[in-house]
Amino acid sequence: MRNSKLPLYIHISLYAVTMFLVLWCMWYFCYHYSLLWLEGFSYFSTLPDVLSLSVVLPEGILDYAGAFLLQFYYYPIVGAALQALYAVVVMLCAMVMVMRLFDNPSHLLWFAALPVPFFVEGQYWNYTLTRSLTWIIVSVVIAVVVYLLTIRNRRRLHLPAFIANVAVEIVALVAIMGFTVYNLGYKDNSCREYEHIWKMEHLAETRQWDALLDITSPDEAQVNGFVRRYALLALLEKGKLADGMFLYNVTSANDFWFKDREEPMCRNYNAMLFRSLGVPNEVIHNTFQQQLQSNFGTSFAVLRRLAETNLETKNYALAKKYMDILSHSTVMSCWVEDRKPQLEAIRNVKPKVEVNGEQFKTSDLLEVTSEIFNLHPENRKCADIVLCGLLAEKNCKDFYLAFKVIADKQYAHSESIPRYYQEALMLLSVNTPGVLDGYSIDSDVRSEFQDVKKLVKNGEKDRVKSLYPNTFWAYYF
């Protein structure tokens, strides 16, 4: 019986399909949210003035081509396919060289896979795709040159039989695949750390607060400022900030936001915090600051938020402006069409304008939220930020002054007072018994506080933290 041998084109196809599937799975399942972030950080438009401003010959052409491709990352399944395809194209170009240079190339195709691990090693950090496109262009040029040089001279290199055999091919291919997976997914731990940040960012953007709390554990929050802040944002949204924030290593009011940090991810978080607090002007301010950090002058994430914020505030002119800008991209035109009914509904509506007054100084979050509460006393989230911020600063005196004002607005009808506020009032009552008048304190809080007083009196403050870990008392002492 004769040995069956696969045709060369099937051999090549198997290599390409296998490499594509492995890389697609890596990107889609390991870096799903990074793909979404890449799209949000990019910007592409068909407007001629954008093209003239963006493209500086010759390097600008690659930026523009990369921006065109990145817009399709809005769909992670497509983004993962494109990321995998770039590596496959590099490998196919190398296969052309193998077929033109070597005798019996069928079992030497693994040579063509050798560049792939080095290609994917730096692929994650290539925000503009210029590196990937450069690799592809260089690979195509080299493949064409080799093809042209071997048209007349068809003399091929002959390698020893022990190299050009199936066993060596399989072992080499498995090793190359393993090296590729390692370089892309495991060599650089910061890739997975940023993937976690982008996942938290996406869940917060889409208001999936329970899912966000599921991936922001108190243990991680001890060492990771992003995890801490996103967990606090989720607690704020769910009305549980004053029942659980001290589990997440809060040490000051600045743990609720990013102060004096200009990175896009920090500005983006601040914008979402102010969105939760109902302060559209600060959402827009932080979004514009985020825009300044974009490699493209603006970004899809920025434009979408500006459009949505102005839709929420019923500012027809500005909402239409940003939606018109987005409509000139290939993918976002569908996003715009979905929101046109919402836009038309506010055409003749007077925009919501924030009350005129002293300009907020966003260098101090507690001042900002205090001012907002004065304007909107029904805003529970602002009240929680003020009170929890003062507790984080261990400023019990100002906490009580603020609580008296806030309680008259939000706890005047026998509403349950959050746990940390009760604990702070009990602590204040030691020197000022009257602070408890008119407030309902749970019996278990009263009972536990008696134990805490005994421990403190006996000089056993350290035991307070071990016996009552998630309490204001443990934090205070």
Named regions from a protein language model:
Residues 2-19, 102-106:
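N-terminal membrane topogenic signal
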Residues 12-36, 176-183:
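Transmembrane signal-anchor helices characteristic of membrane glycosylation enzymes that use polyprenol
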Residues 26-69, 73-78:
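Membrane-interface coil-to-helix junctions
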Residues 84-102, 117-119, 143-147:
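Transmembrane-helix motifs of polytopic, lipid-linked glycan transferases
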Residues 108-121:
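Transmembrane and membrane-interface helices of multi-pass
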Residues 121-131:
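Membrane-interface helix caps and helix-loop-helix hairpins in membrane proteins
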Residues 162-187:
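Internal/C-terminal transmembrane anchor helices
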Residues 186-353, 357, 374-375, 379-393:
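Soluble catalytic regions of membrane-associated enzymes that act on cell-envelope
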